[in-house]
């Protein structure tokens, strides 16, 4: 899957109320990706108005500050049943 561009997480806008990162798309809309999806390993932000996607560059540890800004705790891993 090819992406339109690679964007650093610091260059995106974080919206604490929706826990979503956005970045301007050339079509006039915005690429979107949810904080929890990034925590789960997703790194592709999609524009809801066109077919473009961007690759978001981040380290999982970077997400802690955004959870703090949103006033929520990061998801806890689910323990496997023995």
Swiss-Prot record:
Its cofactor is Fe(2+). Keywords: Cytoplasm, Iron, Metal-binding, Nucleus, Oxidoreductase. Its main location: cytoplasm. InterPro entries: DPH3/4-like (IPR044248), DPH_MB_dom (IPR007872), DPH_MB_sf (IPR036671). It comes from the Eukaryota. GO terms for molecular function: 2-(3-amino-3-carboxypropyl)histidine synthase activity; ferrous iron binding; iron chaperone activity; oxidoreductase activity, acting on iron-sulfur proteins as donors; zinc ion binding. It catalyses: [3Fe-4S](1+)-[protein] + Fe(2+)-[Dph3] = [3Fe-4S](0)-[protein] + Fe(3+)-[Dph3]; 2 [3Fe-4S](0)-[protein] + 2 Fe(2+)-[Dph3] + NADH = 2 [4Fe-4S](1+)-[protein] + 2 [Dph3] + NAD(+) + H(+). The keyword Manganese does not apply. Residues 3-59 form the DPH-type MB domain. Pathway: Protein modification; peptidyl-diphthamide biosynthesis. GO terms for cellular component: cytosol; nucleus. It holds the Pfam family Zn_ribbon_CSL. GO terms for biological process: protein histidyl modification to diphthamide; tRNA wobble base 5-methoxycarbonylmethyl-2-thiouridinylation. It is found in: Cytoplasm; Nucleus. Fe cation binds at residues 25, 27, 47, 50. Gene3D superfamilies: DPH Zinc finger (3.10.660.10). The DPH-type metal-binding (MB) domain can also bind zinc. However, iron is the physiological binding partner as zinc binding impairs the protein electron donor function. Required for the first step of diphthamide biosynthesis, a post-translational modification of histidine which occurs in elongation factor 2. DPH1 and DPH2 transfer a 3-amino-3-carboxypropyl (ACP) group from S-adenosyl-L-methionine (SAM) to a histidine residue, the reaction is assisted by a reduction system comprising KTI11/DPH3 and a NADH-dependent reductase, predominantly CBR1. Acts as an electron donor to reduce the Fe-S cluster in DPH1-DPH2 keeping the [4Fe-4S] clusters in the active and reduced state. Belongs to the DPH3 family. Component of the 2-(3-amino-3-carboxypropyl)histidine synthase complex composed of DPH1, DPH2, DPH3 and a NADH-dependent reductase, predominantly CBR1. This is Diphthamide biosynthesis protein 3.
């Amino acid at each position: 899957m090819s992406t339109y561009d690679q964007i650093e997480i610091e260059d995106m806008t974080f919206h604490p109320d929706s826990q979503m990162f956005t970045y301007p798309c050339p079509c006039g809309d915005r690429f979107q990706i949810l904080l929890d999806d990034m925590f789960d390993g997703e790194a592709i932000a999609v524009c809801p108005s066109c077919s473009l996607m961007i690759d978001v560059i981040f380290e999982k540890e970077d997400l802690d500050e955004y959870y703090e800004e949103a006033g929520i705790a990061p998801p806890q891993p689910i323990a496997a049943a023995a």
